[in-house]
């Protein structure tokens, strides 16, 4: 939150506004703990994606994500325009290099990165379950085959 271009503009900050980042981290930690508690109490399955962490990683390691601009938006000056105020403003030539479309909203590329993280988060959990299920299935087949083999030896 503290790295949003509009926040940095309003706070006259060159760097991310740490207090808002701390609030986001604290909030997300509390959600993660509460979900853990609910999973245990209600025997439910949930997945949690800390979107703040995705933004933080993209801000700290822009090249890894293919960004060249993480401090301002593609629209207008990129520091104050939000939503409707972008209409009529000039935009950057290549939005895929930008993390933000305007001073608050991510670009389509950043939304795609977030979606891919969510799919991977859920997919990893499903893959693990599949691997466990598959391993148990193989163990059952081996056990069944061994029992048949042992039975055939006894019947001789």
What name fits each language-model region?
Residues 107:
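Short, conserved phosphate/pyrophosphate- and ester-handling motifs at nucleotide-, phospho-/glycolipid
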Residues 117-125:
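C-terminal alpha-helix
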């Amino acid at each position: 939150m503290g790295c949003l271009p509009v926040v940095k503009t309003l706070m006259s900050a060159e760097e991310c506004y740490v207090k808002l980042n701390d609030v986001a981290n604290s909030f997300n930690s509390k959600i993660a703990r509460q979900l853990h508690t609910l999973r245990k109490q209600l025997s439910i399955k949930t997945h949690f994606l800390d979107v703040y962490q995705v933004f933080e990683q993209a801000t700290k390691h822009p090249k890894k994500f293919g960004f060249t601009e993480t401090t301002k938006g593609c629209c207008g000056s990129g520091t104050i325009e939000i939503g409707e105020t972008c209409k009529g403003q000039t935009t950057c030539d290549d939005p895929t290099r930008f993390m933000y479309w305007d001073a608050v909203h991510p670009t389509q590329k950043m939304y795609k990165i977030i979606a891919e993280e969510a799919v991977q988060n859920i997919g990893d959990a499903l893959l693990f379950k599949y691997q466990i299920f598959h391993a148990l299935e193989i163990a059952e087949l081996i056990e069944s085959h061994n029992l048949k083999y042992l039975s055939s030896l006894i019947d001789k």
